[in-house]
């Protein structure tokens, strides 16, 4: 299982071409990579995406799982509603979110914002909003799966622990 990763690392230490000529460059490829502005911008965007989706997605999923762990009416319907985006094909989700983020007032999000006097935004075209829009879509897409995982964990906590916590005054 580790061979492909180590072989790729080994290959990265060479400069190659299509004719099989291999020149040892050591860490030169990595030095060149760290000077490439496109790579650095991509690295920064990846960091923003991860920081914008992982903590928010986990906190939101844990909160919803906590709410769904309570004895409420129609619990199966709520679970289905939250899990449905995860099993929906990515193409369908992309089409729906493109419609939501449409640039003019025909977009659902811009239509709602116009009710509050906020001018339409180009959500996917404006660099200051595009990352936010993609993070929001990604959080929504994976929320159901994360809720199911957290809910399974919460439901496996023995009732005695809840009783002990209540006796100890935990809220």
Where do the model's predicted regions map?
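A structural signal for multi-pass alpha-helical bundles of membrane permease subunits
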Residues: 1-171
């Amino acid at each position: 299982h580790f061979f492909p990763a180590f072989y790729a690392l080994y290959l990265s230490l060479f400069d190659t071409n299509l004719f099989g000529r291999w020149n040892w460059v050591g860490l030169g490829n990595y030095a060149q990579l760290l000077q490439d502005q496109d790579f650095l911008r991509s690295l920064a965007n990846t960091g923003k995406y991860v920081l914008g989706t992982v903590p928010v997605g986990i906190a939101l999923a844990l909160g919803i799982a906590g709410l769904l762990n309570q004895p409420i009416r129609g619990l199966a319907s709520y679970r289905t509603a939250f899990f449905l985006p995860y099993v929906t094909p990515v193409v369908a989700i992309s089409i729906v979110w493109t419609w939501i983020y449409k640039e003019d007032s025909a977009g659902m999000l811009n239509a709602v914002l116009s009710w509050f006097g906020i001018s339409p935004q180009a959500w996917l075209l404006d660099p200051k909003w595009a990352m936010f829009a993609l993070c929001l879509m990604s959080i929504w897409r994976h929320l159901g799966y994360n809720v199911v995982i957290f809910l399974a964990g919460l439901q496996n906590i023995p009732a005695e622990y809840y009783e002990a916590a209540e006796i100890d005054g935990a809220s």
